[in-house]
From Swiss-Prot:
InterPro entries to which the protein is assigned, alphabetical: Ankyrin_rpt, Ankyrin_rpt-contain_sf
PROSITE patterns: ANK_REP_REGION (PS50297), ANK_REPEAT (PS50088)
ANK repeats (start-end): 17-46, 50-79, 83-112
Highest taxon of the lineage: Bacteria
Pfam families in UniProt: Ank_2
Protein name: Putative ankyrin repeat protein RF_1087
Keyword tags: ANK repeat, Repeat
Record SMART domains: ANK
Amino acid sequence: MKRIIKKDQSSVINYINDQKLLHLAIRAGYKNIVEYLLKKGANPNIQNNNGETTLHFAAMNGCVRTIECLIKSGAIIDSFDKFERTPLELAINSGNTDAVKLFLQYEATIGNTLNQYLNILVKN
């Protein structure tokens, strides 16, 4: 991957074959590649066709170290996808408690829907 990026950094950093490289690396759990892409200027807020950002993917995977890396790189913590879901909501729906705790530590906004989810979690 590093060779591909060095060859044509401007267009490859964010896309390859219409796929978002950060999204692919996050889904595969390659934290080192995520860090490398961010260092090379990849956009931490890049969205796919459903409006899902890098944090949405990391939240679904429960990858806490990647979530923290993305937030520190400027990822918008309260971004909405086209279904109006935030990364925090996806972490809750996926049962990724460590990710939920991290989002709350970074002061992710808790909306009405999320309040209902959190009340259910607290009762269990």
